[in-house]
Amino acid sequence: MSRVKTTVVRKAGGQVWEDPTLLEWDPNHFRLFVGNLGNDVNDESLYQAFSEYPSLVKTKVVRDREGKTRGFGFVSFKDSDQFLKAWREKNGKYIGSRPVKLSRATSDVKPNEVNEKTIDSKIRNSLYSRTIHHGNRVQKKIKNKHGKNSSKSSRAAQSAAAELISSSSITGARPANSTSVPNAVNTEISAARATESEASRNQTKASRDYSRASSFRRV
């Protein structure tokens, strides 16, 4: 029998995942997103930066698994007026070594009681999970798609060859198969070049004969 647990389920871009860190925040509070934080800012220094507002509840700098800052954090307030005041007064001001960028944090993401089996199934069936855990299946689909395209190209090439054979038959040429078509074309090209070469030689010979005749006349 599957259990029921309280968590925050997030959805975006075809992906479904759990974000248990959002359980630390009271959904009734007003949260600010604090961006462009430097490596020198931690939870305590972020709290000190907003400590002048009495309704300040919590601050947190988001970090990766290795403990490195991800460059942003969150600040929450009980009072909406102080939330707006802090947003207006602190936006663009330096906290640590950088000027921060403030915006309203997403407030429609709230904790819910969900069935463990159901949420696990949704995560597995999301786009992200299909790409990560079923990569072979995705690659197979891509290969099949490319195979279809190749078959179409092959059929088109065969059709073009048949057309060439048909047109050659109309003009009197009767190639035995598609490979004889290029040979017939090459033969015609070679014959044309030979004719052109012979004409050039005849022209050169005529020029020499004319020059000799002219020299005899002068004598």
Curated annotation (Swiss-Prot):
<feature type="compositionally biased region" description="Polar residues">
    <location>
        <begin position="176"/>
        <end position="186"/>
    </location>
</feature>
<dbReference type="GO" id="GO:0045292">
    <property type="term" value="P:mRNA cis splicing, via spliceosome"/>
</dbReference>
<feature type="domain" description="RRM">
    <location>
        <begin position="30"/>
        <end position="107"/>
    </location>
</feature>
<dbReference type="Pfam" id="PF00076">
    <property type="entry name" value="RRM_1"/>
</dbReference>
<dbReference type="InterPro" id="IPR035979">
    <property type="entry name" value="RBD_domain_sf"/>
</dbReference>
<feature type="region of interest" description="Disordered">
    <location>
        <begin position="140"/>
        <end position="219"/>
    </location>
</feature>
<dbReference type="InterPro" id="IPR034215">
    <property type="entry name" value="RBM42_RRM"/>
</dbReference>
<dbReference type="GO" id="GO:0003729">
    <property type="term" value="F:mRNA binding"/>
</dbReference>
<feature type="compositionally biased region" description="Low complexity">
    <location>
        <begin position="150"/>
        <end position="169"/>
    </location>
</feature>
<dbReference type="GO" id="GO:0005634">
    <property type="term" value="C:nucleus"/>
</dbReference>
<dbReference type="GO" id="GO:0046540">
    <property type="term" value="C:U4/U6 x U5 tri-snRNP complex"/>
</dbReference>
<dbReference type="InterPro" id="IPR050825">
    <property type="entry name" value="RBM42_RBP45_47-like"/>
</dbReference>
<keyword id="KW-0694">RNA-binding</keyword>
<dbReference type="InterPro" id="IPR012677">
    <property type="entry name" value="Nucleotide-bd_a/b_plait_sf"/>
</dbReference>
<dbReference type="InterPro" id="IPR000504">
    <property type="entry name" value="RRM_dom"/>
</dbReference>
<protein>
    <recommendedName>
        <fullName>Uncharacterized RNA-binding protein C22E12.02</fullName>
    </recommendedName>
</protein>
<feature type="compositionally biased region" description="Basic residues">
    <location>
        <begin position="140"/>
        <end position="149"/>
    </location>
</feature>
